[in-house]
A protein has these predicted regions:
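Mobile cap/lid helix-loop segments that border enzyme active or cofactor-binding sites
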Residues: 1-60, 186-188
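Iron-sulfur (Fe-S) cluster-binding segments and ferredoxin-like electron-carrier domains
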Residues: 41-44, 82-101
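Amphipathic alpha-helical hairpins
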Residues: 59, 63-67
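Acidic/His metal-coordination segments adjacent to aromatic residues that form catalytic metal sites
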Residues: 102-116
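Acidic/histidine-rich alpha-helical segments that form the ligand environment
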Residues: 113-156
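Preference for long, well-ordered alpha-helical segments
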Residues: 142, 149-188
């Protein structure tokens, strides 16, 4: 499986450092980074977006943000994103039952291991990741009751960042990179 287009044969010198960082962080020469070299402004802005997204905050731990990333990947049905964001499920302590709920195979509310805040973050991510966007007032009331303004912005920007990558990966036909050893897409 390959992308719709090939990477450029020559990469501008100022993007080579970013490609080196990507390889150092992921252990791979990622196709998305190489394809973005066709339009250096997109490569630079995408790199900045990726570098500045929250991976933990004082009240939003790594697990909650991981759940948001994985849920956004699954809702957008992006194979590359699912592969990238599910590789460390065990580090984030995502159980098989929780994964089934994220995949939509079981109800999130029925999973006792999700905290109230995690359930709300998952639902918020689903709402952010669907088209058309719709945020029921009753849900927003619950959200603002359980999260600070800062936390809501971090949840929204994390989900939006994954959605950016999901649409970009799919628009360029980028296949999974092989980070995880199994497909996390729910069965058809």
């Amino acid at each position: 499986m390959s992308a719709f287009i090939d990477p450029p044969k020559h990469v501008p010198f100022y993007l080579k450092f970013g490609l080196w960082i990507t390889k150092r962080v992921t252990g791979q020469e990622l196709l998305p980074a190489r394809l973005l070299a066709w339009y250096p402004k997109a490569a630079i802005s995408s790199g900045i977006l990726e570098a500045l997204v929250a991976h933990r905050d004082e009240n939003l731990d790594e697990r909650m943000l991981k759940l948001v990333r994985l849920q956004a990947s699954l809702t957008a049905a992006c194979p590359f994103c699912i592969d990238m964001n599910s590789v460390e499920d065990t580090h984030a302590r995502v159980t098989p039952e929780e994964l089934a709920a994220l995949q939509g195979r079981t109800d999130v509310e029925s999973v006792a291991t999700f905290s109230v805040r995690e359930k709300l973050a998952i639902e918020y991510t689903r709402l952010i990741s669907r088209t058309p966007l719709s945020f029921p007032p009753a849900f927003i009331q619950k959200l603002v009751k359980h999260f600070t303004e800062r936390e809501i912005v971090i949840l929204a920007t994390t989900a939006a960042q994954v959605n950016y990558w999901a649409r970009l990966m799919q628009a360029l036909g980028i296949p999974p990179a092989g980070f995880s050893d199994q497909c996390k897409l729910p069965p058809a």
